[in-house]
Amino acid sequence: MTNYQHELYFAHCHGHPKKPLEIYMFVDPLCPECWSLEPVIKKLKIRYGRFFTLRIIASASLTALNKKRKKHLLAEAWEKIASRSGMSCDGNVWFEQDQPLSSPYMAALAFKAAELQGRKAGMQFLRNMQESLFVSKKNITDENVLLEIAENTSLDLEEFKKDLHSQSAVKALQCDMKIAAEMDVSVNPTLTFFNTQHEDEGLKVPGSYSYDVYEEILFEMLGDEPKPSETPPLECFIEYFRFVASKEIALVYDLSLEEVEKEMKKLAFAKKVAKVEAKHGMFWKSLSTYSDEYQSCEK
């Protein structure tokens, strides 16, 4: 499909000053619960992205994670979240790294450094960080890994290196932390919904829930139940997002995992996707030549 055809389905997801709602999503790049919300966010943006702007706020816990007595508990928690959500996150990463996942601050700072190259760039960098950690078991608190992710995200690498150690990124992260403190956010993920056309306080939703919960809140904030936008053809969806989980496809298209497997096998046979197996669930990588810098359906 051409870039124009992709935009027919995804243009409404991008930011626009006249959208009636803003959603602040507080995330920690190392948080598996945040990762587990990816299918929900994709479906919400595709169906109703014309009504809201999504703003990602870094809300990393600054508690040290490298205490040996905690590793087995963290690993167990990851395994449970993966089993429940269908979004793979391998708890073995806590035992297999030469260096511990010790600095959530560094991962959050890297996200803000990437965001200095544009919000789309930041969104795609965050997604790539999550894939690197939860699927590939890479240490995203290690600077060399972060540089590799930046390169894979097609960022200006020299600019990213400079920004990673700049006061600009630090101030941007401090700004996010201030927002989290002002909104009394203590749980990741947290979504806060604001109606930009009213002065009412926002509606804060700590934790992760099913898609239906967020859709209902969206309707409540809009005061209406609008018709959803057309869902793109599956091949278009894969081309646009490049690397997606079976769980994401299942939720967006209201399919069972068995039905997803059947449909994706057809695309794999046509050499349009490659299957990527993970510890929990399956992922699919687009093999198309379509390239649109920072495909993330953002803003």
From Swiss-Prot:
CDD domains: DsbA_FrnE_like. Induction: Expressed throughout cell growth. Negatively influences its own expression. It holds the Pfam family Thioredoxin_5. Keywords: Cytoplasm, Metal-binding, Zinc. Irreversible aggregation upon several stress conditions prevents interaction with Spx and therefore leads to Spx stabilization. Inhibited by interaction with SpxO/YuzO. Its main location: cytoplasm. GO terms for molecular function: metal ion binding. Disruption phenotype: Strains lacking this gene show poor growth, affected sporulation, complete loss of competence development and overproduce Spx under unperturbed growth. Mutants also overproduce TrxA and show reduced sensitivity to disulfide stress. SUPFAM superfamilies: Thioredoxin-like. One of its GO terms (cellular component) is cytoplasm. It comes from the Bacteria. It is found in: Cytoplasm. Belongs to the SpxH family. The histidine-rich N terminus is essential for interaction with Spx. Adapter protein required for efficient degradation of Spx by ClpXP under non-stress conditions. Interaction with Spx stabilizes Spx and exposes the C-terminus of Spx for recognition and proteolysis by ClpXP. Is specific for Spx and does not enhance proteolysis by ClpCP protease. Probably binds 2 zinc ions. Interacts with Spx. Interacts with SpxO/YuzO. HAMAP family: Adapter_SpxH (MF_02245). This is ClpXP adapter protein SpxH. It comes from Bacillus subtilis (strain 168).
